[in-house]
């Protein structure tokens, strides 16, 4: 599907130079005093991980990759693969572990429903839920009289991840974590 360079957003996947590229940063729109406006894109190759910077005229058209989305349930890890089950056909598939960012892998909990985006039947990207509920395994003791302030303390979660939490939380409590930037949201209800 052709898309105008002006309409490209961060996270879009493009077909460019016979490869798939993800736009890894917000496009930089520039209109110099002399000459036409252009768009500067930082793109990352989905296969090799190499980054390139390309400049396109704002009137250029690029090929946006058409991705298919299906819901799967995460079952378990096996060596360098994740085992997922299709929620409609109950077929199991293996997906490379490298398809997901290493800092988000600990938050992929068993039986979590995720979306797998495929291009020509090849998995390209996993879309995790926006938030997950995890338990605080270890943190410094509760501070009496602590209220919601700007000061945070480190905590180790049940999945092994480290995160900063407010001082009024203690070990054993469940919290909601936003996966976009791996940050504390609130106590789990």
Swiss-Prot record:
SUPFAM superfamilies in UniProt: Nucleic acid-binding proteins, Translation proteins SH3-like domain
Alphabetical keyword list: Cytoplasm, Elongation factor, Protein biosynthesis
SMART domains assigned to the protein according to its UniProt record, in alphabetical order: EFP, Elong-fact-P_C
An example Gene Ontology CC term for this record: cytoplasm
Major localization listed first in the record, in broad terms: cytoplasm
GO BP terms in the entry: peptide biosynthetic process
GO molecular function: translation elongation factor activity
Localization of this protein: Cytoplasm
InterPro entries to which the protein is assigned, alphabetical: Elong-fact-P_C, NA-bd_OB-fold, Rib_uL2_dom2, Transl_elong_fac_P/YeiP, Transl_elong_KOW-like, Transl_elong_P/YeiP_cen, Transl_elong_P/YeiP_CS, Transl_elongation_fac_P
Pathway: Protein biosynthesis; polypeptide chain elongation
PANTHER family for the chain: ELONGATION FACTOR P, TRANSLATION ELONGATION FACTOR KOW-LIKE DOMAIN-CONTAINING PROTEIN
Family assignment from sequence similarity: Belongs to the elongation factor P family.
HAMAP family: EF_P (MF_00141)
Job of this protein: Involved in peptide bond synthesis. Stimulates efficient translation and peptide-bond synthesis on native or reconstituted 70S ribosomes in vitro. Probably functions indirectly by altering the affinity of the ribosome for aminoacyl-tRNA, thus increasing their reactivity as acceptors for peptidyl transferase.
Protein name per Swiss-Prot or TrEMBL: Elongation factor P
Higher taxonomy: Bacteria, Pseudomonadati, Pseudomonadota, Alphaproteobacteria, Rickettsiales
Gene that specifies this protein: efp
